Amino acid sequence: MNMQQPNQPVMRFIADGMLGRLARWLRILGYDTTYEKVITDEALIERAVRENRRLLTRDRRLTLRKLLRDRHILIVSDDIEGQLHQLHRDLKIDLDLTHRQGYRCADCNVALTTISHNDAASLVPPFVAEQYQAFLQCAHCRRVFWPGTHWQDLTRRLTAIRARSLDTQP
């Protein structure tokens, strides 16, 4: 895990109430992705237009709204791997955690900032402070992140999705 704070991805998303899990993954990948579980279709569309975000939806009716024009993606898969594969294929989103992107809090959607090992040591379990040197923190919820086994699992899953994308290219 490269804990440097590289450039933020430019694409911004808003996910409808059926895509909370996808919103969390996109945030981890560094994409500014808003998500509200309960929001009217009108408010969702208005926010997408006002904030210049692409609407991610599983609702075919929403994609027919004129205000959205080309600012929407109809997500066809029910599973997260299929959803990420579709966005990688259709929008060329980067599914690599090791470079380029800044990272965002999966809960808050706030960009994470690097914190020193000394600052992190008082906020994480002692064995984590002993084992890891690089830490990021959310300025909003104060949650601390480090490149542990969960990060390795995410990386493996994303590598498999990228390989799947290569297998399905013409």
Predicted regions: what they are:
Residues 102, 112, 121:
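SIR2/sirtuin NAD+-dependent deacylase catalytic core
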Residues 1-100:
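Long, charged N-terminal interaction/targeting segments
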Residues 105-108, 138-141:
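Short cysteine-rich clusters marking metal-coordination/redox-active sites
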Residues 122-135:
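Short linker/helix segments within small regulatory modules
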Residues 99-103, 130-133:
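Flanking scaffold residues of small Cys/His-coordinated metal-binding clusters
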Residues 9-29, 131-134, 147-166, 170:
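Extended interfacial segments that mediate partner engagement and assembly in macromolecular machines
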Residues 110-117, 146:
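Short functional micro-motifs and their immediate structural scaffolds
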Residues 65-67, 117, 150:
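Short glycine-/acidic-enriched loop or helix-start segments at secondary-structure transitions
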